[in-house]
Amino acid sequence: MKLWGGRFEKNTDKSVDDFNSSIRFDCRMYKQDILGSIAHAKMLGKCKIISEEDSILIQNTLREILKDIEEGKVQFEIDAEDIHMNVEKILISRIGDVGKKLHTGRSRNDQVALDIRMYLRDEVVEIRKLLVNLERTLIEIAKNNIDTILPGYTHLQRAQPITFAHHMMAYFQMFKRDIERLNDCYKRINVMPLGSGALASTTYPLDRYMVAKELGFDSITENSLDAVSDRDFVIELSACLSILMMHLSRFSEEIILWASHEFGFIELDDAYSTGSSIMPQKKNPDVAELVRGKTGRVYGDLMALLSVMKSLPLAYNKDMQEDKEAIFDAVDTVKMCLPVFTKMIETMKIKKENMLRAAQGGFTNATDMADYLVKKGIPFRNAHEIIGKMVLYCIENNKAIEELDMSEFKSFSELIEEDVYEEISLSKCVSGRNLPGGPAKESVMASIENGLKFLSTQ
């Protein structure tokens, strides 16, 4: 007999039990469910809704059940539907009618809202730790490559010289925003819904603030109808994780490009590469490719959540059971990707000579050549046109700009002097860009210092 079966004259069909049950995936919330029930039982006793003796017995038995689950001594039942009913059924089997008092003043609607909030806030903390580890790795790579020059790209065409440190710190900023988004999302997750009942609260004199304090929530929900039907926090976290994966995917794409012979900027460690079943020479960046591929999976989880919640009337609907597999999958995927990605970039070999050689080609100093003329008094648009013609001349004559002799320079502008060679050297092109946020050494070091300060607060 179901715990809710009093109104029914027959048992549910086995196919309905199988279809309706969520225990196979929501069982992972057993700890949060039991901790929430312990706090609820403690509050029921303190508020004299049940006796103190019964409250203590329920709490102690729930702790025993938690220990037994963690030791693998408990087998959940499909016909008990979900983690909430499974735990309650086990409780009743151990202490009889006293266990039946636990659900006083509570519905599964506010109970599941509590469990998922407690579960997700724990996961946010774990993901944030993984991100901080990634950020520290990026800073170490940046420190070791302050003077490593490579071309910066636009449209995947060589554009201007930067440093590898500057490039790594660009990704640091992306993941910093991810941490900030998670921190902000955490605020809306960490709101306590218990006491909202099925939808209209309860007539019992519950102390919601006590339960919130016991469970470490910052505040309580302010509308019972909203509290049991709200999954914004789930969708918001899914969106945060989707953006995070987008950043990992962009980084992965560059890793894949850089590891190719066409770029040759890095070599991935053997431990983070794979081979081919037919081509003996292959060393494939499978980790980066799989991270890139799993990004679409996390996007799909977000779209699934949005689709489930679309058009649902207030308050709780069974559709909302579908929220868990999507958010669990997104969380699991991110937690799987971050550690292996961090180790992959931590162990990769930086080919500084190849990076410099690439920066020396492709006229990456052309903008600085135009700026040189501007500093001599030529309007920028005129300088832009002059240097465009100079680049065309260099292409036709198979020369780099810095390889032109003075007579060739003078053919484009009489204002060009011997100092041009120093001004358009790659090192000067980089060091001259010393504004805050620029690629110059002092600018990147300041960015690293700011990054370390940020991480110290996480």
Curated annotation (Swiss-Prot):
Q: Which GO terms describe its cellular component?
A: cytosol
Documented EC number(s): 4.3.2.1
Keyword Glycoprotein (UniProt): no
Could you tell me which InterPro entries the record lists for this protein?
Arg_succ_lyase_C (IPR029419), Argininosuccinate_lyase (IPR009049), Fumarase/histidase_N (IPR024083), Fumarate_lyase_CS (IPR020557), Fumarate_lyase_fam (IPR000362), Fumarate_lyase_N (IPR022761), L-Aspartase-like (IPR008948)
Tell me the keywords, alphabetical order.
Amino-acid biosynthesis, Arginine biosynthesis, Cytoplasm, Lyase
Enumerate the GO terms in the molecular function aspect. Answer: argininosuccinate lyase activity
**Gene3D superfamilies annotated for this entry?**
Fumarase/aspartase (C-terminal domain) (1.10.40.30), Fumarase/aspartase (Central domain) (1.20.200.10), Fumarase/aspartase (N-terminal domain) (1.10.275.10)
Any one of the GO BP annotations: arginine biosynthetic process via ornithine
Q: Pathway involvement?
A: Amino-acid biosynthesis; L-arginine biosynthesis; L-arginine from L-ornithine and carbamoyl phosphate: step 3/3
> What reaction(s) does this enzyme catalyze?
2-(N(omega)-L-arginino)succinate = fumarate + L-arginine
Record-stated family? Belongs to the lyase 1 family. Argininosuccinate lyase subfamily.
Output this protein's name. Answer: Argininosuccinate lyase
